From Swiss-Prot:
Subcellular location: Cytoplasm
Positions of Na(+) binding: G157, C160, T163
GO molecular function, one term: metal ion binding
Disulfide bond annotation, renumbered to this chain: none
Name of protein: ATP-dependent protease subunit HslV
PANTHER family found in the cross-reference section: ATP-DEPENDENT PROTEASE SUBUNIT HSLV, METALLOPROTEASE TLDD
Major location category of this protein: cytoplasm
Family per record: Belongs to the peptidase T1B family. HslV subfamily.
PROSITE patterns to which the protein is assigned, alphabetical: PROTEASOME_BETA_2
Cited HAMAP family: HslV
A GO CC term attached to the entry: proteasome core complex
Amino acid sequence: MTTIVSVRRNGKVVMGGDGQVSLGNTVMKGNAKKVRRLYHGQVIAGFAGATADAFTLFERFEGQLEKHQGHLVRAAVELAKEWRTDRSLSRLEAMLAVANKDASLIITGNGDVVEPEDGLIAMGSGGAYAQAAARALLNKTDLSAREIAETALNIAGDICVFTNHNLTIEEQDLAD
């Protein structure tokens, strides 16, 4: 699996993920890019779960973004509906985290679209560790969104055997 973290703070949204791809108990790749930009660089997206499934979902989500002129919530809801009702999509095992200047969302294969109330997303095999670390740092420090995401991912990488320290971080100003 993997760990994806997204943090909103002080006019920035940051999303990061580790680079480990595992097949069972074997590390197959250590430098995968699980966080990327979509829709003309205006949306940051990350995935946890089966890699091939996630790429299919990225393509479908980007199609929904194009169809709805980059409106993140509308595109996410439409993807979730499609994911829930399309037989081939309903078998996909992945989750998406997506963020832009307006919102941060988790999209699940059950058709859920969740906007966390504190702007913090942490998912994947190391998600609980990363969430605990990020929440503590958000509440007790003045660190930047990027510093919080990096620290949370590194803590998850120290604890979770399916998460490594080869990080991809994307950052966007909320004013853009």
